[in-house]
């Protein structure tokens, strides 16, 4: 990497950080509940990776809200290069648990939401991999939404491991232009 490329990259990173740090500061008071607490920040700090679940099903309204929250994530040039696959079929969940080395907890989960990159919607050229960032932001929104609803969830990486991508693609019959980035298994937390 030459000096001009490094400078361009650092300038972009610095600009992004500066915008993040100064943007939205004027309305901080509107983000607080009447108690004076910033519930968004508290939700971020409360979120944990949960790997023990109850078998209690999740209501369709909650699943829809989780996906809507994921879709509210920012994306480069508003491309929204994602697809979400909600899996609640026990046989498919068990296959995912059997096929993926770090997803054994899926055997307990009542559902999984698979976050995929849709390459037909992705940017072209040197920004052709921004879909990964966009899908990661969507995944974090999904995890935070699950936390706010009292659901436990964990994300399990699939991409960039080609063997995992192939296994998920096979189990879910995904077309070639859809790449599974990761999936989450939201569920009511096992508190016992």
Residue map of PLM features:
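Conserved hydrophobic/aromatic beta-strand scaffold that supports enzyme active sites
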Residues: 43, 112-116, 182
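Solvent-exposed coil/turn segments that connect beta secondary-structure elements
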Residues: 89-90, 118, 159
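A glycine-rich helix N-cap at a beta->alpha junction
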Residues: 172-185
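Conserved small/polar residues in nucleotide/adenosyl-binding loops
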Residues: 184-192
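Bacterial N-terminal signal peptides that target proteins for export
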Residues: 2-11
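Small-aliphatic-rich amphipathic alpha-helix that forms the alpha element of a beta-alpha
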Residues: 66, 70-71, 113, 126-170
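Bacterial N-terminal signal peptides
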Residues: 12-20
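N-terminal amphipathic, basic helical "cap/leader" segment at the start of enzyme domains
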Residues: 25-111
């Amino acid at each position: 990497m030459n000096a001009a490329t490094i400078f361009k990259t650092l300038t972009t990173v610095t600009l992004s950080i500066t915008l993040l740090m100064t943007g939205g500061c004027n309305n901080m008071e509107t983000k607080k509940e009447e108690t004076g607490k910033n519930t968004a920040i508290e939700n971020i700090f409360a979120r944990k990776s949960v790997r023990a679940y109850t078998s209690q099903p999740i209501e369709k309204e909650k699943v829809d809200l989780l996906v809507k929250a994921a879709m509210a994530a920012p994306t480069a040039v508003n491309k929204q290069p994602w697809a979400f696959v909600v899996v609640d079929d026990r046989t498919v969940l068990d296959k995912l648990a059997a096929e993926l080395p770090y997803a054994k907890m899926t055997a307990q989960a009542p559902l999984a939401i698979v976050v995929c990159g849709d390459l037909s919607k992705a940017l072209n050229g040197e920004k052709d991999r921004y879909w990964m960032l966009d899908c990661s932001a969507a995944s974090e929104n999904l995890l935070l939404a699950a936390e706010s609803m009292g659901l436990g969830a964990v994300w399990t990486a699939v991409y960039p491991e080609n063997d995992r991508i192939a296994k998920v693609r096979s189990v879910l019959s995904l077309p070639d232009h859809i790449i599974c980035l990761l999936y989450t298994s939201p569920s009511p937390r096992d508190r016992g």
